[in-house]
Amino acid sequence: MTDKRKDGSGKLLYCSFCGKSQHEVRKLIAGPSVYICDECVDLCNDIIREEIKEVAPHRERSALPTPHEIRNHLDDYVIGQEQAKKVLAVAVYNHYKRLRNGDTSNGVELGKSNILLIGPTGSGKTLLAETLARLLDVPFTMADATTLTEAGYVGEDVENIIQKLLQKCDYDVQKAQRGIVYIDEIDKISRKSDNPSITRDVSGEGVQQALLKLIEGTVAAVPPQGGRKHPQQEFLQVDTSKILFICGGAFAGLDKVISHRVETGSGIGFGATVKAKSDKASEGELLAQVEPEDLIKFGLIPEFIGRLPVVATLNELSEEALIQILKEPKNALTKQYQALFNLEGVDLEFRDEALDAIAKKAMARKTGARGLRSIVEAALLDTMYDLPSMEDVEKGVIDESVIDGQSKPLLIYGKPEAQQASGE
């Protein structure tokens, strides 16, 4: 760099890249015979960030897991529901394959495959959606359909769902457009009859109408902060056609609708198939036979059902499945409490009889896997309260009587350190 002197008394330093003097910039960083200013450093960072953004999609394309890999990952965290896992694995794989290869393939437009999960409370609907998002490393948000209303009414706008998704990825629109949205309690926004409503139904059919475009694909204008309260803010444009929507609900009573259709279709008179009570299909078997007409009778509008072409049904969890859930998944409940006790230096053992008792209680409460934590928490509350103040506890043992509230956990004490030292 050519030296430039000022008044012949000292050097005036210049940035080797943009030519600005040390007085025109905030900072000038010196290297071997060269200088760079803070403005040029910022510019270099911007260039590198743009390069990374361009490279990222190519990395993602090669990293898309196959349906088998998705299913295997779900097996690590979700017990049972084999058919639902297979349906989800294929639907999710096809959705992200569509995103990474464009919406068309050889001139054929690829449709959007949103998913409807039907199953009782605590059967694993939410966990399946969360696990998928974690595997694919995409933003994930949950919404409760019962809190949603049409725009202009008291309650949450459907656009707030997209705002929550943006919050999860620091308002990065590109990331949000690859995200997963799970809308729970979707059965609660069914209309009261399968005939069009005469009066305004702002939290039922009205919400279904409001969700239609969002789920199918539209460019939603979402303010970065707040919904209706800050209309003056600059809106973010989010293309929802690239977002995977998974809707879930218990659909209590849907089995009766299906049963009526199946029995009506089996014939009447001399040609009718006579079934004994023992031949009646279980709720899970009936739900597996669900058709769009059943969902319409239940109260979903035809247009809304059309936006959810992939339907997966989940069975009510058996007692054996609940015991597996307690001990087998990577983040099993017993493993979580054992990790908590390990932080206090205490080993925690759950005997098989205790696991049986927990599962029986959950079955009696009809809460599925969701009720397991509250049962274990209640049984261990006093111990977790006292343990940090206790010394020399080495192990805790949980048996059936602890779960039934008849006794406290058996605590096994070790020798105090002073005694151990003197005994040696």
Curated annotation (Swiss-Prot):
Keywords linked to the UniProt accession: ATP-binding, Chaperone, Metal-binding, Nucleotide-binding, Zinc
Superkingdom per UniProt: Bacteria
Gene3D superfamilies, per database record: 1.10.8.60, ClpX chaperone, C4-type zinc finger domain (6.20.220.10), P-loop containing nucleotide triphosphate hydrolases (3.40.50.300)
Annotated SUPFAM superfamilies: Glucocorticoid receptor-like (DNA-binding domain), P-loop containing nucleoside triphosphate hydrolases
Molecular function (Gene Ontology), one example: ATP hydrolysis activity
Oligomer status and interactors: Component of the ClpX-ClpP complex. Forms a hexameric ring that, in the presence of ATP, binds to fourteen ClpP subunits assembled into a disk-like structure with a central cavity, resembling the structure of eukaryotic proteasomes.
Family: Belongs to the ClpX chaperone family.
Protein name (Swiss-Prot/TrEMBL): ATP-dependent Clp protease ATP-binding subunit ClpX
Protein species of origin: Shigella boydii serotype 4 (strain Sb227)
